[in-house]
């Protein structure tokens, strides 16, 4: 069961942390089950830094099927993370379909948003992809989506998977006209490598042909969070 898999989460995290140290890289893991002290089951992932430190992020919005099949609870953690490369945010799969979360992160200075995801159909994938591209435009940031491919026969909710990982950008003169920095081959296991220039974001914030962050009408509307930003 998914709850049984949670007993391996600490071990998996330590393995990724060791890889981050060994290869001198920062790793944003895929998500995995995690049981908190009160017994509630969550979908979480980890930022494993090359200096040996790590942070955990939680999936805030769980799908109806995740509740029905696995009994997952939604997390309460909405925050950005500092790395030696950039200030980043992480939204797990379905979370990217809620623009409020990424806007809160953008207000905290997020430069790159990472979206690990698992979708079983092209419909589900399209929701994640289209929303991810919208988040890049709205928040004037880079967005990286990384999804699972392959099949696990007879494993409920994991038997079929469809993905095309990619790196998306805002749509303005300094960026690709279609907002696509790099894309993997659809539904194919591969490594996608891409460089991004954070200085372009600073220029966009000030000199962009449109300025989605600066031009908000705060005199008409506002975004507020009711819970603490961290649990």
Question: Where in this protein do the model-derived segments appear?
Answer:
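Metal-dependent catalytic neighborhoods of phosphoester/phosphodiester hydrolases
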Residues: 1-9, 38-40
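CN hydrolase (nitrilase-like) catalytic-core segments centered on the catalytic cysteine
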Residues: 8-28, 97-189
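Active-site catalytic loop in hydrolytic enzyme cores
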Residues: 14, 18, 36-111, 121-134
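Recurrent small/Gly-Pro-centered beta-turn motifs in extracellular repeat architectures
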Residues: 31-32
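Conserved hydrophobic/aromatic positions in well-ordered beta-strands
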Residues: 46-48, 166-168, 192
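Hydrophobic residues at beta-strand termini and immediately following loops
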Residues: 57, 81, 146, 184, ...
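Cysteine/selenocysteine-centered motifs that mediate thiol-based redox chemistry or coordinate metal-sulfur cofactors
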Residues: 83-108, 201-231
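A hydrophobic, small-residue-rich beta->alpha segment in the mid-to-C-terminal subdomain
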Residues: 181-203
């Amino acid at each position: 069961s998914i709850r049984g898999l949670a007993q391996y989460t600490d071990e998996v995290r330590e393995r990724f942390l060791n890889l981050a140290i060994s290869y001198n890289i920062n790793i944003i893991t895929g998500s995995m089950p995690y049981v908190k002290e009160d017994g509630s089951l969550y979908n979480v992932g980890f930022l494993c830094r090359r200096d040996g430190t790590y942070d955990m992020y939680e999936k805030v919005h769980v799908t109806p099927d995740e509740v029905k099949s696995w009994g997952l609870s939604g997390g309460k953690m909405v925050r950005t993370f500092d790395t030696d490369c950039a200030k980043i945010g992480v939204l797990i799969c379905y979370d990217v379909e809620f623009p409020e979360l990424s806007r809160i992160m953008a207000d905290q200075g997020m430069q790159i948003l990472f979206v690990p995801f698992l979708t079983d159909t092209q419909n589900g994938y399209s929701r994640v992809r289209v929303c991810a591209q919208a988040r890049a435009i709205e928040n004037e940031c880079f967005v990286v989506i990384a999804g699972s491919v392959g099949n696990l026969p007879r494993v409920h909710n994991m038997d079929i998977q469809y993905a095309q990982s990619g790196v998306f950008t805002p749509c303005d003169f300094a960026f690709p006209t279609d907002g696509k920095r790099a894309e993997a081959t659809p539904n194919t296991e591969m490594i996608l490598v891409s460089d991004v220039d954070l200085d372009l974001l600073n220029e966009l914030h000030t000199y962009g042909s449109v300025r989605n962050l600066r031009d908000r009408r705060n005199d008409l509307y506002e975004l507020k969070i009711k819970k603490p930003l961290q649990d």
